[in-house]
Structures are given as C-alpha cells and as structure tokens.
Design a protein with these regions (language model features):
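C-terminal, charged and often intrinsically disordered regions of DNA end-processing helicases
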Residues: 1-7, 296
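Hydrophobic (often cysteine-bearing) scaffold residues that line and stabilize catalytic clefts
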Residues: 7, 11, 75, 186-189
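A non-catalytic, helix-rich entry segment at domain boundaries
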Residues: 14, 18-105
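Short amphipathic alpha-helical face segments that pack within enzyme cores
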Residues: 14-17, 185-195
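Hydrophobic/aromatic-lined pockets within catalytic cores
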Residues: 19-27, 126, 157-161, 195-199
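Non-catalytic protein-protein interaction segments used by genome-maintenance enzymes to assemble
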Residues: 107-137, 143-189
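Metal-dependent nuclease catalytic regions and adjoining charged, substrate-binding loops involved
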Residues: 182, 195-296
C-alpha cells in the first residue's frame, strides 16, 4: 500500500488484533496459496499474551512525521489500557461463552440495485448464544429466547490528541472521549454487515467504543439506531450513496484512458480538500489530486 498510515490507525489495529487473538476461533486472512482471503484457525492467546503480541506489532509502525512520532510514543502507554477496556466490554456481553467466534470475516454482498458488490470485513461475529442467558446481550427480539443467532460486533477506538508543549518541553495529551451516540458512518457499516449476514440466521448488532479508561456498548436494547427498522434505513442510506457513485462513474464508461476519466470527473466533482480525512492518501497521491483539480 502506498497510502500513509497514522499512529491512531495503527493503535486501533493493535487493540483489534489483541482482542481477536484472545477470543477468536477463526480469523480470516490472505491465503497466499489460494491467493484470496480464507479463514484460519486461531490458537487463542491469554490476555497478557495478546497485548504483548499486539504491542510488538505496533512497535514496528514507522511514524510519518514528528507529531505522529509523539503520538506513537504516547499510545505505547495507552494501548494496553485500551485493550483491558476491550476485554471488560467483550466479557460483559459474553463473547467468551461462544464456541464459534470469527474475526475479519470477508463479506461480499450483492444488492441487485448495484452493478458491483459491497465488500467489507467484520471485526467479530459469534454464534450459539441464548438470549435468555446473555444479560446485556439479550436482543429485543427477531428470534426466540432459545434460538441460536449471530451477534455482529463492530469495534471503534478513540485516542488522545497532542496538546500544548509543557514548560519542561514534553507534549501534553488530551483525554480521549467516548461518544454519546454512534457515528452515522459506523451505523451504516454495521447495518451492511447485519444485512449481509442475516441470510444465515437472525442477527444482533453491537457497536463498541473504547478509550484507555472506559468503554460504551451500543445495542438494540439501549440504542434505537440499532433496532431492526432503523438499521434497515442506515443500510438504505449506504446503498443510495453507492448508487449515486455508480451513476456518476457511468458517465465516463465510454472513455478509454484513465487520465481522461480523471479529467472529466474533476469537472463534475468538488474535491473538498479541506475534509478532515478524505485526503489522507499519502503525499504523492495528494499532490497528484491537487494537480488534476488545479487545471479545472
């Protein structure tokens, strides 16, 4: 990949890895022999072992600038704490009681309104729970109290931001905060996974946010956004967005040269270079984009 990463992203991956290595029976990853994603059996690690392995991987991350270097150093202290919050949250909903926990499942979902499939990879899904014994995980009811169902879990992390330089020359960091309501993009993502996986069995959605000192679990019992009718609406929002993008690209289907297609797209689309993350694509690609739009 040529896109630049950042310490926040690398830290989030580290936490996700640690949780998956501790709880998962199977983890989907690239199979070089078959040249595609496939499930691989996971030898579950202890919580301490999972954190240690995740930190070893995170330490290999190369910062892209000085601020990113400072964030990496700070997150080396707070990643283990964030992992511990994740363990508490996962244990609270009973992930450890499932005999089939799957991570990074490859989802390839076809919607007949679209020319291309919608693809993604789940953080975690798990089966064989009974709603009557699940406590906080009990669903509001697409399934019977004793019927097996699939819980689909999406995990998000929030990280401390660098602040002012202290008198001693060290950098201060603000505390990470949990959201009071889920992010709409996260809801659309989870809605897509639930829609695709509902073909297998009834599903229960979970959206979990972590910081180094706390966590919050959103489910259909405490968050109206995750009720089935509202999840369906978020899925529809996602599909309509995909339809608009396909309609836009269809305008240029007769053009042969990639540069011609880019040139025409630049005439029709506002680049939004001030967006907080759309253009985190690496210096080379960002410079190329600026060049394309500067001539329009």
């Amino acid at each position: 990949r040529e896109f630049e990463g950042n310490a926040n992203m690398a830290a989030g991956v580290a936490v996700n890895d640690a949780l998956q290595w501790h709880y998962s029976n199977d983890i989907w990853s690239f199979n070089p022999n078959k040249r595609k994603l496939a499930p691989h059996s996971n030898d579950k690690l202890s919580k301490d072992g999972a954190i240690a392995k995740a930190m070893e991987k995170f330490n290999e991350y190369v910062p892209v600038n000085e601020t990113d270097r400072l964030k990496k150093e700070h997150y080396q202290e707070t990643i283990p704490q964030t992992c511990q919050q994740g363990f508490i949250a996962f244990d609270k909903i009973g992930v450890q009681n499932s005999n089939k926990v799957v991570a990074e499942d490859s989802i390839n979902h076809t919607d007949n309104r679209l020319s291309l499939p919608i693809v993604g990879r789940t953080d975690l899904h798990f089966t064989d729970f009974n709603a009557s014994s699940q406590g906080v995980a009990a669903s509001s009811g697409d399934h019977g109290s004793d019927a097996p169902f699939l819980s689909v879990l999406e995990l998000k992390t929030s990280w401390q931001r660098p602040g002012r330089v202290r008198k001693d020359g060290t950098r201060s960091f603000s505390s990470a905060k949990l959201p009071s309501t889920p992010n709409i993009l996260h809801l659309q993502q989870l809605a897509f996974y639930c829609c695709a996986l509902r073909k297998q069995m009834p599903v229960s959605p979970y959206l979990i946010y972590l910081t180094e000192g706390d966590f919050i679990i959103f489910n259909e019992k405490n968050c109206a956004d995750l009720e089935p009718v509202n999840l369906k609406n978020y899925y529809e929002q996602l599909v309509q967005n995909c339809i608009r993008k396909e309609r836009l690209l269809a305008r240029y289907v007769d053009l042969d040269e990639p540069d011609m297609i880019l040139s025409e797209i630049a005439k029709d689309v506002e680049p939004m270079f001030d967006h907080p993350f759309y253009w985190n694509i690496g210096a080379k690609h960002y410079a190329r984009a600026k060049e394309i739009w500067s001539t329009k």
